């Protein structure tokens, strides 16, 4: 049987890069990893709590963390940075304080910067959030998938595959439905494929959304 590998891990070092850039002694590695997870969760929770965009999309593409001996540099890639840049110094300062409280890192400086994503709907995380918002508002899953594909087509992608699994439309038996538009060559290593797996809670239970976007071939 075919083994389904994560497309991002499969392409690390060729078309994908690590989102955490730091070195550590083997014994301290797990601590560093947990620290990264705390930073990411804290930022996502802050954005979720304080952001009210009509589409319900937070627009976090990914969060990059670079660590040196005395500095932690966090770069947030946002699709819709209006929320954080409106009251920029105040909002970012507040976010920094929140993250520092969570980490309890007194002897290290924390810098947070924001980078705008040119085509937000080229990023599967942003797209998954959009679909999740639609499903929570009880829009039919087929309609939500169709709309998501239309949004990516405007971003000049070469192909997209969307899969939603769970109790679709409140049916008793869980199933998976998927739709593909264009090419999605998962076995081609030089093909740059963005992927994300996202969980959404609806009134019928938990649904899993998976999105593969074929951006370009190198």
UniProtKB/Swiss-Prot annotation:
It comes from the Eukaryota. Transmembrane segments: none annotated. InterPro entries: KH_dom-like_a/b, KH_dom_type_2, KH_sf_prok-type, Ribosomal_S3_C_sf, Ribosomal_uS3_bac-typ, Ribosomal_uS3_C, Ribosomal_uS3_CS. Keywords: Chloroplast, Plastid, Ribonucleoprotein, Ribosomal protein, RNA-binding, rRNA-binding. Its main location: plastid. GO terms for cellular component: chloroplast; cytosolic small ribosomal subunit. One of its GO terms (molecular function) is rRNA binding. CDD domains: KH-II_30S_S3 (cd02412). It is found in: Plastid, Chloroplast. The keyword RNA-binding applies. Residues 43-118 form the KH type-2 domain. One of its GO terms (biological process) is translation. Belongs to the universal ribosomal protein uS3 family. Part of the 30S ribosomal subunit. NCBIfam families: rpsC_bact. This is Small ribosomal subunit protein uS3c. It comes from Populus alba.
């Amino acid at each position: 049987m075919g083994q389904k590998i994560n497309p991002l891990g499969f392409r690390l070092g060729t078309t994908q890069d690590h989102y955490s850039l730091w070195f550590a002694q083997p014994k301290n590695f797990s601590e560093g990893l947990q620290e990264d997870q705390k930073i990411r969760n804290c930022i996502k929770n802050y954005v979720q709590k304080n952001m009210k965009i009509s589409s319900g999309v937070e627009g976090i593409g990914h969060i990059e963390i670079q660590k040196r001996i005395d500095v932690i540099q966090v770069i947030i890639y946002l699709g819709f940075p209006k929320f954080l840049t409106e009251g920029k110094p105040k909002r970012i300062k507040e976010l920094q304080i929140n993250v520092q409280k969570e980490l309890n890192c007194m002897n290290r400086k924390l810098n947070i910067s924001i980078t705008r994503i040119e085509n937000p709907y080229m990023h599967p995380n942003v797209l998954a959030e959009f679909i999740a918002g639609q499903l929570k508002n009880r829009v039919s899953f087929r309609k939500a998938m169709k709309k998501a594909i239309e949004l990516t087509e405007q971003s000049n992608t070469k192909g997209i595959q969307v899969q939603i699994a769970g109790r679709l439309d409140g049916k008793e038996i869980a199933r998976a439905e998927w739709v593909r538009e264009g090419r999605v060559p998962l076995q081609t290593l030089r093909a740059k494929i963005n992927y994300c797996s996202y969980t959404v809670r609806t009134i019928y239970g938990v649904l899993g959304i998976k999105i593969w976007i074929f951006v370009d071939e190198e």
